[in-house]
Amino acid sequence: IENEFGEIGIDGGFLKESGIQINELNAGCICCSLVGDFRAALQQVVEQYHPDRIVIEPSGVGKLSDVTRAVEGVAEHLDVQLSSFVTVADVNKVKMYMKNFGEFYDDQISHASCIILSRTQNATEEKIAAAVAMLREKNPTATIVTTAWDALTGEQILKAMSTKDDFKAELIAMAAKANEEHA
């Protein structure tokens, strides 16, 4: 499901040519004006395709926290489970974006469960480390992927996206076991 704030979708044609089923929601944001359309689109995808995974690309103008709430609200009515919120950050512009976009960018970073750094293939180790440190200040728990685009596989991205859920499940299991032992 792709959400473009403008009236014309940018990526839809390319994705369709690649054989990816896409449902476009244009001229608004799924976290506010298009939430009803989003619910219908998500329900259609679930019922028609029965997918293992749905990728939702929101518009670039909504806060990730608002988008997350919209997705959670829709998910309450469907048999879907939220697993990951991914954002991409340009290794060369993290500092500038934090300064120029403030709350909007901070919200994007702080609510992501996985942050993929882009443009790392030409960045120095120092530049990457500095970007990671700035991101960690805003989000100490997110998985941060620094692998260069040309070396990054879809499998690696999926693993990074699911790491936190696996860790959370492991912690819950450990807590349950500890409670059983003390009962």
What is each of the regions a protein language model found here?
Residues 1-98:
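Nucleotide-state-sensitive switch-loop elements of NTP-binding domains
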Residues 84, 113-114:
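Well-ordered beta-strand positions
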Residues 3-5, 120, 149:
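Short, ordered loop/turn segments at secondary-structure junctions
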